[in-house]
Amino acid sequence: MVQQKERETFSQRLALACDKAGLPLHGRQADLAVRLKVTPKAISKWFNGESIPRKDKMESLASVLGTTAAYLHGYADDDGITVNHLSRSNDYYRVDVLDVQASAGPGTMVSNEFIEKIRAIEYTTEQARILFNGRPQESVKVITVRGDSMEGTINPGDEIFVDVSITCFDGDGIYVFVYGKTMHVKRLQMQKNRLAVISDNAAYDRWYIEEGEEEQLHILAKVLIRQSIDYKRFG
């Protein structure tokens, strides 16, 4: 009973500390998971009053929030938090990296599981303006590519920056889309009254989405930028 009360007190204090520090409610748990290098599931248990972090993680959590472990435990009343010190600065642009892979290959089965944010990449607003042409940060996400059908343009393991606000065909380009029950990253090109689905790797044949088959096509995003994971070994 005592342990349950301690967990509940910690959960309440944690939420209050996050609010005062200015940590946005949307994405709060994922943000803390990235900062503290723990799993989103562990963070969820803290907020739900199911568990309390170990001493080292409690100290790290308190440091991030600008308070003390004693406050989070409920032993002290003064939180010591500087109001809104974690609120997003207008000088930064954050891009979420999502725990999902798009297939540049034969296709990946679509999962109904909730897609977690696993980390975020920060840019200055000027860097973001140049990279993303003024798109709002909510529209830009990063996912990992698997498969080799786009090799030469996008290689297996590369990360791609995508615009998730584009959910219909928006002119020739590379898209992340679902056809039937599989997810793909391919080049789409309108040819008369049908869409050509093109793999930049010549080993893969192109295929077509004909009139009457459009209902099976669901565009999720348009690809903006590729970030390569290529390594060169010199010793």
UniProtKB/Swiss-Prot annotation:
Start-end of DNA-binding region: 25-44
Keywords, alphabetical: DNA-binding, Repressor, Transcription, Transcription regulation
CDD domains the UniProt entry points to: HTH_XRE (cd00093), S24_LexA-like (cd06529)
Top-rank taxon, per record: Viruses
Leader sequence residues: none
Keyword Transcription regulation tagged: yes
GO molecular function: DNA binding
Keyword field contains Transcription regulation: yes
Span of domain HTH cro/C1-type: 14-72
Listed Pfam families: HTH_3, Peptidase_S24
Protein name listed in UniProt: 26 kDa repressor protein
Source organism: Escherichia phage HK022
Record gene name: CI-HTT
